Amino acid sequence: MPVRWREPVNIKAPVSGDVRVDGPFEALIVLLEEWPDLRGSGYVRARSMCRAAVAGHKDAEDARKIFVVAAKEAKLLH
């Protein structure tokens, strides 16, 4: 069963529109398929943290924090 965050992150994805992201696995999908800038430092850090959280090597809530920072940087956060 995928790890879920205590609180979801709602973003406005360029392709899918409004997206509710409930955990690091869903965040990885958004990062890999929907992200507007694949070179930004926030993107790279969020991708790395979410991968590590999915693998059980990092805390999922820490990955959420990094994902939120990246979403703000990319101007995707609601």
PLM regions: where:
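Generic preference for hydrophobic/aromatic residues in regular secondary structure cores
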Residues: 9-10, 19, 66
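Short, charged/polar N-terminal "headpieces" of proteins
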Residues: 1-11
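A short, structured beta-strand/loop element
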Residues: 15-46
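Generic secondary-structure microfeatures
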Residues: 13-15, 71
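Short, compact, well-ordered microdomains
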Residues: 51-78
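A short linear-motif detector with a strong N-terminal bias
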Residues: 9-10, 33, 55
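Short, functionally important structural connectors and interaction interfaces within domains
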Residues: 1-3, 30, 68
